[in-house]
Regions:
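Solvent-exposed alpha-helices and their adjacent loops that cap or buttress functional pockets
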Residues: 1-3, 28, 64-68, 110-113, ...
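Short active-site-adjacent helix-start/loop capping segments
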Residues: 17-19, 43-47, 52, 81-85, ...
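Short alpha-helical segments and helix-capping/turn motifs at coil-helix boundaries
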Residues: 18-22, 59, 104-105, 133-135
Length: 184
């Protein structure tokens, strides 16, 4: 039978990935089977089991995960791709890394059958601490029960165009061009 599962989508900017993996550790510490995924892109995390949909053993590995006792974390995505820092990226690393590409929303919803808790990074912000979403964002699956919004407090007092993804929308609101607590 289907296990009860909490679908949690994490959106916004600064701190999404850290928040997602901290929650994963806490839920695993409570004996839950946790799947971590994305509907956009995330860097491939170190120290976690990763299974990709484009691997032939994908479904078999998901089934094995369901049979494990609680307290485990599995990271899954559609595929792995090379990533090099672009001119609009604000990630702290310059070297080439691997990124995981998210699955389609209907595919993510199916992961609920294999876990107790499903954590989804559902937004991208090019590594910046603040984001104004476009009309098609964030990519939240219908099965989401909780949405957590993140923003980096390091942006407070900084110039919007330096710390905000899609800053042009905020610059129209704030004439002095600075990020404030109220703005976040």
């Amino acid at each position: 039978g289907k296990r009860p599962c909490r679908g949690i989508s994490i959106v916004g900017a600064g701190g999404k990935t850290s928040t997602m993996f901290q929650l994963a550790k806490e839920y695993a510490g409570m004996g839950k089977r946790v799947i971590v995924t994305t509907s956009t892109h995330i860097f491939r995390p170190d120290g976690y089991e990763v299974v990709l949909k484009d691997q032939p053993e994908w479904l078999e590995r998901l089934m094995e995960f369901t049979e494990k006792p609680g307290g485990n974390i599995l990271v899954t995505a559609a595929e792995e791709m090379d990533w090099k820092k672009g001119k609009n990226d604000n990630f702290p690393c310059d070297k080439a890394k691997k990124k995981l590409k998210g699955m389609e929303p209907h595919e993510i919803g199916r992961l609920l059958n294999y876990c107790d808790v499903l954590l989804i990074e559902a937004d991208g912000s090019k590594g910046l601490p603040v984001k104004v979403p476009a009309e098609h964002e964030p990519v939240i699956i219908p099965e989401t029960q909780v949405v957590i919004g993140c923003a980096g407090l390091t942006a407070i007092g900084e110039m919007i165009q330096e710390v905000c993804f899609r800053s042009e929308f905020l610059e129209r609101i704030r004439k002095d061009g600075k990020v404030t607590e109220q703005l976040l």
